[in-house]
């Protein structure tokens, strides 16, 4: 196999992986539309996961609390991959995480796909909890 065909194979594999991720993401979006009546964006999905992980439903959250909930979501999503671990909760019930290893260098699209992949894994492992 020459290096040209090897490079083409790698490009094809990357495209297939992205296409598979996109299809799985569309399937998740469709199930969330069915559940909530509209298509949530990535931030809304992170917010919902944050509420799920926080475990307390409130009438309203402040802007800072909403950001904290999205941070909880990201830490919870990346914990199974070894990036974070739960250290405990404070007196108000807010979870606190410790970063175990740095995030890989990624551009914005790669970061979004990285998060989407972890969100899909979360929904696979916590089916029907949102």
Language-model region placement:
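Structural motif
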Residues: 34-42, 60-69
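Short, hydrophobic/amphipathic alpha-helical patches that form generic packing surfaces
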Residues: 44-55, 69-80, 117
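Helix-rich interaction surfaces within compact, conserved domain-sized segments
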Residues: 102-129
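Amphipathic protein-protein interaction modules
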Residues: 61-111
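N-terminal low-complexity, intrinsically disordered segments
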Residues: 15-54
């Amino acid at each position: 196999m020459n290096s040209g065909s090897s490079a083409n194979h790698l490009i094809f594999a990357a495209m297939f992986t992205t296409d598979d991720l996109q299809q799985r993401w569309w399937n998740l979006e469709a199930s969330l539309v069915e559940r909530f009546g509209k298509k949530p964006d990535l931030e809304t999905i992170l917010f919902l996961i944050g509420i799920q992980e926080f475990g307390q439903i409130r009438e309203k959250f402040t802007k800072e609390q909403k950001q904290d909930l999205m941070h909880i979501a990201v830490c919870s999503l990346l914990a199974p991959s070894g990036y974070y671990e739960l250290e405990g909760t404070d007196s108000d019930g807010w979870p606190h995480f410790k970063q175990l290893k740095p995030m890989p260098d990624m551009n914005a699209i790669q970061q979004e796909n990285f998060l989407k992949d972890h969100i899909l894994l979360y929904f696979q492992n916590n089916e029907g909890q949102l």
